[in-house]
Every structure is written in C-alpha cells, then in structure tokens.
Amino acid sequence: MQNFADALPVIRRMLDSDVQAAYDGDPAARSVDEVLLCYPGVLAVTYHRLAHQLYISHVPLLARMIAELAHSATGIDIHPGAQIGSRFFIDHGTGVVIGETTIIGERVRIYQAVTLGAKRFETDEAGNLQKEYARHPIVEDDVVIYAGATILGRVVIGKGSVIGGNVWLTRSVAPNSQIMQSGNNKSSAP
C-alpha cells in the first residue's frame, strides 16, 4: 500500500490534466468545476486512475471493486489493468468499454459506445483459456475515436489518427490516418 500512497501526487497531476482536457475539448463546458463535478467520463477516469494504481500495486480485487463502482455510476467500463496516459477525455461515455491490456497514449479523446476489446481468446493445448497476454488495442498519442467505434485485438492505432463513428477495426492503422465508415473503411493520411 506504500506504493499507492506514494503515487497519489502523480495521480492528482494526471487527474488535473484529464479535467483540463475535458474542459478544453468540449465547447459545451462552461467551467472546470462543471467538468469536475458533472462529467461522467471524468468520474470514470478518476476511479480508474485510483483502481489502476491498486492493480499495479498487487491489490487486484479492490481495484476491480472500484472499477465496478465506476461502471455502475457512469456506464463506462474500464478494466483497472488498462494503461492510460495523461489528458485523457471520455465525452458522454455511456457504453465505453476499455479492456485489461489496452494501452492508451497522451491526449486521447473517445466518445460514447467505443469498445477497445479483445478479438478472440487464446487457449492452451488442453483448451483452457489463456490469461495475462496482450489482447487489446494500443492507441497512440493524439488520437480521437468517435461514437460507436469498435477496435478489437492487439492492433495499433497510430499517432494523430481519427477513427470515425461506428467503424469496426481489427487491423492496425498508420499514424495520421482517418478511418471513416462509408460502405467500406477507408484509410487516408491528411
């Protein structure tokens, strides 16, 4: 638990950056206080930052309990094992799912109903479900993922990319790509 206590100043700085990202990234935000007190995405990320520190401090049950409190309160399901960089903003948020081995970089923004999940679950020779392997996406810095997007498997969403609403992805995306739904997913660099 000493690790947890030692990490609190860092967690506080991360949370300050998350609140500022929400305020800066939402034209409807009228004040930092409004963001801090009224935005479910900020509440979910607050719980997550605490739960993640407990998770990496080898207190996984308490971490999962905190994550489930956040899920119940906000409709946002973030596994405490997920690694999330600073200035992270979930706008609206209902239905967001972020899996255990997801890695999210700095200055990432996602919208409601986004799933960062596993594509499949590996088994050993006896058919037993494998655990503790990387199976969720890596989202690099400065990425925006719009409502309803589903990104599955250990794929990389390159820095500066934009993933449009309702896009279904099971492949990696190069930096600065724009992936939109229009019959077929298209990839283009700006």
Question: What is each model feature region?
Answer:
Residues A70-S187:
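Structural signal for interior beta-strand "rungs" in well-ordered beta-sheet cores
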